[in-house]
Design a protein with these regions (language model features):
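Canonical Radical SAM [4Fe-4S] cluster-binding loop centered on the CxxxCxxC motif
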Residues: 1-25
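Secondary-structure transition/capping residues
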Residues: 15-18, 164, 207
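Conserved AdoMet/S-adenosylmethionine-binding subsite of the radical SAM
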Residues: 30-44, 53-189
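Short, charge-patterned binding micro-sites
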Residues: 50
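Charged phosphate-binding loop/patch that engages nucleotide di/tri-phosphates or the phosphate backbone
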Residues: 186-207
Length: 207
């Protein structure tokens, strides 16, 4: 439900690519048979996307995974706070990872789609106060993420437990223009990390 130009999963956003995925769907029973065989080897399942909270059967699916004896990690962009509340109430999730695209004032520039800033703010609060382990994370893109932007993100996330800065990769993107962009150097990312450590308890880098 977002259209970030640098999205690394364009197959879940572009309509033509989505059609191809639909023809390759794995039946649910096949998925759960696979999990059954992996008991004792796998600890959990990550439900990602795209945006999993827009799927009507997410709660039911996550509960089935839990009932099968596995932990559930949910990746989200925070646009469906009510879904997050239901997942927590039903004990259908064990870990959250929420994408923080940019500072609140710059979201529209990045996501290129209709969204509610209030929903994103609410989701952040729900996750942070859920009592469950979580991480917030931002993919850093040159020209989009600067020291000023990270200062604003830091003010918003102040007191958060865990935050990761993920380096942009140009191998696969939604918009062609981003295929020409390069990621930040490790030195530049470390500078962002040091800045963010003023605001969050734990900050890491993913190259």
């Amino acid at each position: 439900n977002f259209r970030c130009g640098y999205c690394h999963n364009p197959q879940f956003v572009d309509e033509e690519q989505i059609k191809n995925i639909r023809t390759e769907n794995i039946p649910e029973e096949v998925f759960f048979k696979f999990l059954e065989k992996r008991k004792g080897k796998l600890e959990g399942v990550c439900i990602s996307g795209g945006e999993p909270t827009i799927q009507a059967d997410l709660l039911e699916f996550a509960l089935k995974i839990k009932q099968a004896g596995f932990l559930v990690k949910l990746d989200t962009n925070g646009t469906k706070s009510l879904v997050l509340e239901k997942m927590i109430a039903e004990k259908a999730v064990d870990f959250f990872a929420m994408d923080i695209k940019t500072s609140l004032s710059r979201y529209e520039e990045i996501v290129g789609a209709g969204f509610s800033v209030e929903e994103i703010k609410k989701s952040k609060e729900i996750i942070q106060n859920s009592g469950l382990p979580y991480e917030f994370r931002t993919t850093a893109v040159k020209g989009k993420h600067t020291r000023e932007v990270f200062e604003e993100i830091g003010e918003w996330l102040k007191g958060a437990e865990t935050y990761f800065i993920q380096n942009f990769r140009n191998k696969k993107t939604l918009a062609e223009e981003y295929k020409k962009e390069e990621g930040f150097s490790e030195k530049e990312l470390v500078e962002f990390k040091l800045l963010m450590k003023k605001y969050v308890k734990n900050c890491g880098i993913r190259m």
